[in-house]
Amino acid sequence: MIEALKPLVLAAVVTLILGPPVLAFLRRLKAGQTVRSDGPRSHLAKAGTPTMGGVLFLIGLTVSTLVLAPPSPLTLSTLILTWGYALIGLVDDGLKVILHRPLGLMARQKLGGQVLLGLVAGVAAMLWLGRGSVIQVPVTGWHWDLGWYYPLLAALLLVATTNAVNLTDGLDGLAAGITLWVALAYGILALTLGQGELVTFAMALAGGCLGFLVYNFHPARVFMGDTGSLALGAAIGFLAIMTRTELVLPVLGGVYVLETLSVILQVVSFRLTGRRLFRMSPLHHHFELGGWPESRVVLFFWALAIIMALAGLYLLTI
């Protein structure tokens, strides 16, 4: 177990060391966040905070994984996929900065890139990385061979996870803190499965998030942007794919699911009844507008993330 902590520590240290120069570089680029006018009014003060900060933990994750993981197709695939989704986010963030608007890529452009990468990842996992096309149904012991439908499931999972993390990234330290616990859960799971490369990757991901929180917790000095949130979602989604826990991910990453459901329910309720279920969605804004300080909301959701991660691990033991 001590060996498994090395990737976490190395990624955290690299992220911490890179923080000051990367933040200075982003300020020189004037890569400030444009805040949406329809969000909580308290967030208007965050305008101008450097964005695209996800590159910080991405570098920490990459360095730690390459240094400590045995070189293999799986190691390289996890990094390439994570950076592929990060690149979509980087383009999106860059357009926001250049055009001085809260929206970057068009939705269909963003979604198209995510689906394409997801399909490629699904095929690669099935044919070249030894994952196969069988999914396991938790608790029941059932197995289901999807054959060539599996890449579709993989793409759906990756697109859903990346966008769920993106929705969760709405408060200082929220997405990074939640992903820290989900990544730790996957590190423990991969350790029990004897998947050494995934142990290193998952723990390095947790370490990168930990180091990033030093700069991202309230009041944040940098935001991860879509660069970071899409990368985190891809990393978690691919961990689920390669550990064959696609159907357990909604529990392990339960907070992501709650955030996404709150948005869906809000839209459906308003269209059907003209009323909103929540003060604002995603769910974290509901608590924020209810008078909770931002840090309290974040810590509450972190605690919920820990509970859900433990519940997911327990589910796999039944």
UniProtKB/Swiss-Prot annotation:
Subcellular location: Cell membrane
Principal location listed in the UniProt entry: membrane
A single cellular component GO annotation: plasma membrane
Requisite cofactors: Mg(2+)
CDD domains (alphabetical): GT_MraY (cd06852)
GO process terms (BP): cell division; cell wall organization; peptidoglycan biosynthetic process; regulation of cell shape
EC identifiers of the protein: 2.7.8.13
One Pfam family per UniProt: MraY_sig1
Topology class, membrane: Multi-pass membrane protein
Purpose: Catalyzes the initial step of the lipid cycle reactions in the biosynthesis of the cell wall peptidoglycan: transfers peptidoglycan precursor phospho-MurNAc-pentapeptide from UDP-MurNAc-pentapeptide onto the lipid carrier undecaprenyl phosphate, yielding undecaprenyl-pyrophosphoryl-MurNAc-pentapeptide, known as lipid I.
Similarity comment text for this entry: Belongs to the glycosyltransferase 4 family. MraY subfamily.
The protein's name: Phospho-N-acetylmuramoyl-pentapeptide-transferase
Biological source species: Moorella thermoacetica (strain ATCC 39073 / JCM 9320)
Native organism taxonomy: Bacteria, Bacillati, Bacillota, Clostridia, Moorellales
Protein encoded by which gene: mraY
